[in-house]
Amino acid sequence: MNNLLFVDASPHGSRSLGARIAREAIAQWQAAHPHARVVSRSLGQPGLPSISADYAHALVARQPDSDPALACSEQLIAEVEHSDGVLISTPMHNFTVPAALKLWIDFVLRIGRTFAATPEGKVGLLADRPVLVLVRSGGICRGAAARQPDFLTPYLKQVLAVIGFSTVDFIYLEGVAPDDAAIDAVRGQLAQSALLARRATETA
């Protein structure tokens, strides 16, 4: 079984340019694995519930996974656990991840469930798998032409490493109105990512 989890963090949903590129990545995955299952998790409207006092209490009290307050977290973690690869499409908001993606992270990073706290630091409890992050930024945040900082990339790398994911690629689509050449360049990078290159190799 080759399951792909697609996490879409754009408030524009399927209408966003990032989502359009993501659909092309998904199509490449499905072409390599016609019977693969794709699970889509949209973080736009209506979005995930806010972190509640009951949820916070369940974490502190180390309640069992079956506790109703942990239901949303359990569902999101299960989607990650059952995947063989993860595709995240996200805008960059104020130099970092949007609030909707931060909320998903807060539900997925859970002590005793996706990571363990040890004297040496946090250790991931999930097996590594390829992750591809498509980043849509209105400003230029990389290279000599950068005019704004990028806190999204190092933050997401650390977040994913905490739960055990180290095979992570980032592809960026920058600028308010990227031209066709920029979009084609992004398309060319898709096949070079661990997520899609590995799948192409497996079917060769």
From Swiss-Prot:
GO terms for molecular function: electron transfer activity; FMN binding; oxidoreductase activity, acting on NAD(P)H as acceptor; oxidoreductase activity, acting on NAD(P)H, quinone or similar compound as acceptor. It catalyses: 2 a quinone + NADH + H(+) = 2 a 1,4-benzosemiquinone + NAD(+); N,N-dimethyl-1,4-phenylenediamine + anthranilate + 2 NAD(+) = 2-(4-dimethylaminophenyl)diazenylbenzoate + 2 NADH + 2 H(+). Pfam families: Flavodoxin_2. FMN binds at residue 10. It is an enzyme of class 1 (oxidoreductase). Keywords: Flavoprotein, FMN, NAD, Oxidoreductase. Its cofactor is FMN. It comes from the Bacteria. Binds 1 FMN per subunit. Signal peptide: none annotated. Its EC number is 1.6.5.-, 1.7.1.17. InterPro entries: Flavodoxin_fold, Flavoprotein-like_sf, FMN-dep_NADH:Q_OxRdtase_AzoR1, NADH:quinone_OxRdtase_FMN_depd. PANTHER family: FMN-DEPENDENT NADH-AZOREDUCTASE 1 (PTHR43741), FMN-DEPENDENT NADH:QUINONE OXIDOREDUCTASE (PTHR43741:SF2). Homodimer. Quinone reductase that provides resistance to thiol-specific stress caused by electrophilic quinones. Belongs to the azoreductase type 1 family. This is FMN-dependent NADH:quinone oxidoreductase 5.
